[in-house]
Amino acid sequence: MMIESKGLIKTQSKAITKNQPTSCSVSINREKQRIFNEYGTFDNVLMSFAPSSQVGSKMPIGKAFKSNAPTLTYLDLCYGEGSAITWLVAWVSDVYGICGFVNNEATDNIKIMTANAIKDEYYFLNLNELITFFKMFIAGKFEKFYKKPNPQVITKSL
């Protein structure tokens, strides 16, 4: 009888934990739904937050912090692993280009490594915060490159 009770308890507890969403999973799903409702496809996110769509616009860091733009983590959660890197590579490429690196001085490998370093350390930042940083970096408000593209110059500035 005791063995049957333990088996029944084990079965019931598995069913309960399997069917009950946690408050964390509910919050994640709610945020994912908000992002899908606001931006739709990943292409829409890329277009809305692309370097070319930011020309002439300026957002103070306080407003960027309070914005509802998705974070790097939520880009991957909503649109698949690698989405954040895709978005970051576009911006990192823009930064290296504007800072004078041409003719493949900033290789694709350097751009991807820079994007990965940013994502790994700053996964919690939203896209508007990162855009504000990239614009300030381009404006010369942080570290400077010396002769060669160096991912640490960007990550150290961030």
Question: What residue ranges belong to the model's regions?
Answer:
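Charged interaction scaffolds used for protein-protein
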Residues: 1-158
